[in-house]
């Protein structure tokens, strides 16, 4: 099993299959992904934003809801956020930014997370809705200016 390491910018052989997190081995012939995020974040929803409620730099970009990790031990769990990726001509055109965060609360373990983003929708007014399958809530994010 090969995975892409965005920090090394290469595919590496997974430890369970004889790798050490650095060994390329039989992974060298695989294509690199168009875009990569940290391991185990768990993307659950993708929304291409076509509204005009948010500032212009968000138009035609992609929002991604990350459900959060469950198996990064001994590292701190990650994800539990919504990111934005700028797009141009159907491809990512810049670095992602954390758009909404803090869902896990102070406890960042899978069972201890207060909320886990799992769905995205755009409202008729262009606002962004985020659903949560841990706490059962829905957030509405609106832009009111600086």
Give short role names for the model-derived ranges.
Residues 118, 124-126:
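Structured DNA-binding interfaces in DNA transaction proteins
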Residues 1-111, 115, 141-146:
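Beta-propeller domain segments
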Residues 62-64, 127-130:
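Hydrophobic beta-strand segments that make up the repeating blades of beta-propeller
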Residues 122, 132-133:
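Conserved beta-strand->loop/alpha-helix structural units within folded catalytic cores of enzymes
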Residues 134-136, 145:
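A short, acidic, flexible beta-alpha connecting loop/helix-capping segment that sits on the rim
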């Amino acid at each position: 099993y090969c995975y892409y390491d965005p920090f090394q910018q290469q595919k590496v052989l997974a430890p369970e299959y004889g790798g050490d997190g650095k060994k390329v081995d039989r992974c060298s012939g695989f294509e690199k992904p168009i875009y990569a995020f940290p391991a185990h974040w768990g993307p659950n929803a993708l929304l291409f934003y076509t509204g005009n409620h948010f500032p212009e730099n968000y138009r035609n970009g992609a929002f991604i809801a990350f459900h959060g990790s469950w198996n990064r031990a001994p590292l701190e769990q990650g994800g539990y956020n919504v990111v934005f990726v700028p797009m141009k001509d159907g491809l990512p055109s810049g670095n992602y930014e954390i758009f909404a965060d803090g869902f896990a609360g102070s406890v960042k373990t899978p069972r201890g997370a207060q909320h886990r983003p799992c769905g995205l929708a755009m409202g008729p007014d262009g606002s962004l809705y985020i659903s949560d399958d841990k706490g059962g809530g829905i957030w509405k994010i609106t832009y009111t200016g600086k």
